[in-house]
Curated annotation (Swiss-Prot):
PTM comment: Glycosylated.
Official protein name in the record: Calprismin
Origin organism lineage: Eukaryota, Metazoa, Spiralia, Lophotrochozoa, Mollusca
Additional remarks: Seems to interact with calcium carbonate.
Tissue expression as described in the entry: Expressed by the calcifying mantle epithelium and incorporated into the shell's calcitic prismatic layer.
This protein's UniProt keywords: Glycoprotein
Length: 61
């Protein structure tokens, strides 16, 4: 199950052992995934700050 939440693109999987972003997933509160799924962050829609300036996105420090 793939869920887009704000700038994050999340992957919901049933096997928590397959989650490679477990630490990052813990920051997603509350989890948009069903309780029987683990939350994995696939990617963000915000480009990395070192690539170029990011405009219109406040508080990204």
């Amino acid at each position: 199950i793939t869920i887009e939440q704000g700038e994050l693109v999340l992957n919901c999987i049933s096997d928590k052992m397959m989650c490679e972003f477990e630490a990052a997933a813990e920051m997603v509160v509350p989890s948009p995934c069903p309780s029987e799924y683990d939350t994995c962050i696939l990617e963000t829609n915000i480009p990395p700050a070192n690539q170029x300036p990011v405009h219109x996105i406040p508080x990204m420090h």
